[in-house]
Regions:
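Extreme N-terminal tail/first-helix region
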Residues: 1-18
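A short, cysteine/histidine-rich metal-binding "knuckle" motif
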Residues: 164, 192
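Conserved small/polar residues in nucleotide/adenosyl-binding loops
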Residues: 196-198
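Short, structured beta-strand-loop surface elements
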Residues: 52-125
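Ferredoxin-like iron-sulfur electron-transfer modules
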Residues: 143-161, 172-189
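Flexible glycine-rich active-site/ligand-binding loops centered on an Asp-His dyad
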Residues: 118, 133-150
C-alpha cells in the first residue's frame, strides 16, 4: 500500500485514534482524536484552542497515534503514525465538517466553531500491522520528507546457514538460501533471532 492508502485507511476505516503527546513535565498524555481527512501532504484533525491537547501540540509540535480495526486480536489491523504537526488554522474547517457531518451535532453553529482550529501531521513515519493474515503482514512508511530508518532484525555475515533459526521464528518468515534471509514484511520483531546471534 502507499502512504496515502494508509492515511485513507486511518481516516475511513479507523477514524478514532489514540493520540499521545507530552505534557510540560515530559510525561505522556493520551486522548482519542478523530482523523478527519487525508491527502498526499498528511493527515488532518481539529481541536479547540481552549484544550490542554491544543497547548501540548503547540508546545511540542509532535505526536504519535495508533488505531486498530477488528473484532479481536487475531482479526485486526493496526496502524501507528508518529510525526510533526502544525496548526493550519480554520481554512479547512468547512471541508472537515463536510467530510465528518457528525461534527455539526457537536458544533452546530458558526459561532460555536470560533475556537476550532485544524492541525496537519505533515512529516513522519508509520507502521502497518495485520494480524488477520497468515503469516502476519507488516510494513513501514514515511511521509513529508522524513528519513526512512531501517528497523527490525537482519541476518549478519556471521550466519553459517545452520538452520537453527528456522524453528525459533514464530511466523516462519526465515528462508535459508545460502544464508538465512528474514522476510521483513512478515517479521514480528520478537527478538528470538537476536538470542541465537545470526
Amino acid at each position: 500500500m502507499t502512504t496515502k492508502e494508509y492515511f485513507d485507511y486511518i481516516v475511513e476505516q479507523i477514524h478514532s485514534t489514540v493520540v499521545a503527546t507530552v505534557d510540560e513535565d515530559g510525561l505522556p498524555v493520551t486522548c482519542v482524536i478523530d482523523m478527519m481527512y487525508a491527502d498526499d501532504n498528511g493527515l488532518y484533525f481539529l481541536t479547540a484552542k481552549g484544550k490542554n491537547f491544543y497547548r501540548r501540540l503547540k508546545d511540542k509540535g509532535y505526536l504519535a497515534l495508533s488505531g486498530k480495526k477488528g473484532e479481536d486480536t487475531m482479526n485486526c489491523t493496526a496502524v501507528s503514525v508518529r510525526g510533526k504537526v502544525r496548526e493550519i488554522g480554520q481554512d479547512m474547517l468547512p471541508l472537515l465538517f463536510e467530510k465528518n457531518p457528525y461534527m455539526l451535532e457537536i458544533y452546530p453553529t458558526e459561532e460555536s466553531r470560533k475556537a476550532l482550529t485544524v492541525f496537519q501531521i505533515y512529516e513522519g513515519s508509520g507502521e502497518w500491522f495485520d494480524l488477520s493474515k497468515k503469516p502476519i503482514e507488516r510494513d513501514s512508511f514515511t511521509f513529508g520528507g522524513a528519513e526512512n530508518k531501517a528497523s527490525g532484525y537482519f541476518v549478519t555475515d556471521s550466519c553459517i546457514a545452520c538452520g537453527s533459526c528456522l524453528t525459533d521464528c514464530p511466523q516462519s518468515c526465515i528462508e535459508l538460501n545460502g544464508k538465512a534471509v528474514i522476510r521483513q514484511e512478515n517479521c514480528l520483531h520478537c527478538g528470538n533471532l537476536s538470542l541465537i546471534h545470526i
